[in-house]
Amino acid sequence: MSVTIALDAMGGDHGPQVVVPAALKVLAEMINVKLILIGDRDLLNGLVAIHRGELGTRLTIQHASQKVEMDEAPSQALRAKKDSSMRIAINLVKSRKADACVSAGNTGALMAIARFVLKTLPGIDRPAIVSALPTIRGHCYMLDLGANVDSSAQNLYQFALMGSVLASAIDNIKEPSVGLLNIGSEIIKGNERIKEAGRMLSQSHLNYVGFVEGNDVYEGCVDVVVCDGFVGNVALKSSEGVARMVRHYLRESFQRNYLTRFAGFLALPVLKAFHQRMDPRRYNGANLLGLNGVVIKSHGGADITAFAHAIRIAVIEARKDVPQHISAHLEPWLSEGQVV
């Protein structure tokens, strides 16, 4: 199945210097994929000129006269940046000229513009940011990772529904297990919102296993972890910091003297496998779940490898038509929670 992905080439900390090589990398790896680079036409033409012959019509450029700055207020980006590379990328999804879009730009602006242009799916109040996280047993999906810092029980219920459908669609899991992130597994733990969301989910047809704690996330106890955006973002950033610390200590330990360096040389294959498994670039690319279209948010500081992975995520979710898949499964479940 051929898919077309629109790329915000001007977004992120590195802009076209990362987006263009990442696009070329993906096109070299994946067939039946077309990419649209959106940004400064002259700049982008210069970066892709030497590859024109081999790419043919698989890579096209669409000019954008504006870009959304990383520190720009979402309201300003929405009102004043109608010809920005971010806005045009989302517009292409809306007009079905692209099957998905990817941006490393300002998260708040991306969410505001995407929600304004694409709208949310019927029965969904707020989109959520969801991403795969590595676990001992493979990976799990965690949402929300920062789109909503104050979520109601109803929002959490909807996040659980969407996360379950996503895991089922992408990983072909018949009944994905779902857990609510909490300060304890006992039903008496947590604030009233968490308790109410737990009651709603326990009465649903989802494979809801109850509350899970932070240490359960990376043990792979559940397929889908649900939380509000404040908690999810703190948990995500904390885990990224721990991963960097572990890599630092390993590197430091193997460089203490000649003996440890030799031990490090012998352990190199194991260390490479460890680094690859824990490499955050392999998990770059978060879905703005709950919209009428596929929008993938890349980390703002992503390098070529990381941004290429975000494009691959967009291709997979576009081919699966995740929004349509969610819509088809949501109505009976939403009726259970009386949230339509």
From Swiss-Prot:
Gene3D superfamilies xrefs: Isopropylmalate Dehydrogenase
Molecular function as annotated in GO: phosphate:acyl-[acyl carrier protein] acyltransferase activity
Enzyme Commission number, as recorded: 2.3.1.274
The keyword Cytoplasm is annotated on this UniProt entry: yes
EC main group: transferase
Assembly and interaction partners: Homodimer. Probably interacts with PlsY.
Record's function text: Catalyzes the reversible formation of acyl-phosphate (acyl-PO(4)) from acyl-[acyl-carrier-protein] (acyl-ACP). This enzyme utilizes acyl-ACP as fatty acyl donor, but not acyl-CoA.
The protein's name: Phosphate acyltransferase
Source species of the chain: Nitrosococcus oceani (strain ATCC 19707 / BCRC 17464 / JCM 30415 / NCIMB 11848 / C-107)
Lineage of the species this protein comes from: Bacteria, Pseudomonadati, Pseudomonadota, Gammaproteobacteria, Chromatiales
